[in-house]
Amino acid sequence: KHDNGVGALCTPIFQTSTFEFESVQQGGARFAGQEEGYIYSRLGNPSLTQVEEKLAALEGGEAALATASGMGAISSALWSSVEAGDEIVASDTLYGCTFALLNHGMSKFGVGVKFVDFADLAAVKAALTEKTKVVYLETPCNPTLKVVDIAEVAKIAHEYNKNIRVIVDNTFCSPYIQQPLSLGADVVVHSATKYINGHGDVIAGFVISDAEFIGKCRMFGLKDMTGAVMSPFNAFLIARGLKTLDIRMERHSANAMKVARFLHDHPAIDKVYYPGL
């Protein structure tokens, strides 16, 4: 529970770009990082803080960063993890825009990317080099729903180099069904546009990890690189949506299984891609 200062059951929408200081000295201390407090909503806002705390708790992370979209989350996490000359080992089955960022965007800045079938753990291990800084995957993958063994991939990466950052896109499961950090991942990213918000009226994303990395994402990946800041109103809507996450995910899963079984038995369907079958 986030203390909003007024005892409101639902956190108010702090629709402001800037915040006041009690004195010049206080402003200087905040800009210097010597005092905690809000400065400018690109760096932090109470509406965003309360929903970030909820996502961190749901995923079992120390901290979270709210972003304006799922791609904002992915980009902020990646730009905070690599620099020119580094390499990323990524799953060969990814959301189209993520693939475009890795396949086209990263190369423009001198970052190499290797795409590997993550069902082949030996291939994942073989792709790692001393230049590898990130192992990136989705599970279930978009759009085929292929399942990747997070624990085994994380084990392989960290045994090769404990400093490799394993980043998992958990959009398709949500933290209600799967918590990648508990399986050995270092960072979780979400498109909150989907199940996290759940009402089709928000575009948003999150990065969840340890406090040190989230601080780096906030002050470099988000502030300086992407600028993909979530609006206070969208943070309010997501906090509302999270209240029904468990109920919605139970119904989504039950309905999906019914559809998958129906299609599996239908004579006109050759194959159904669904991990529940």
Located regions from the model:
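A general marker of short, structured functional hotspots
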Residues: S17, G27, Q34-I39, S91, ...
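Conserved N-terminal alpha-helix of the aminotransferase class I/II PLP-enzyme fold
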Residues: S23-S75, C97-H104
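Active-site loops and adjacent core secondary-structure elements that bind or stabilize anionic groups
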Residues: P275-L277
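Conserved PLP-enzyme active-site core in the AAT-like
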Residues: A64-A268, Y273
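N-terminal glycine-rich, Lys/His-bearing helix-loop that initiates the first secondary-structure elements
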Residues: K1-E35
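Residues in well-ordered beta-strands of folded domains
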Residues: F14-T16, S41, Y273
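A generic secondary-structure signal marking the coil-to-beta-strand transition
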Residues: L9-I13, E36, A63, N234, ...
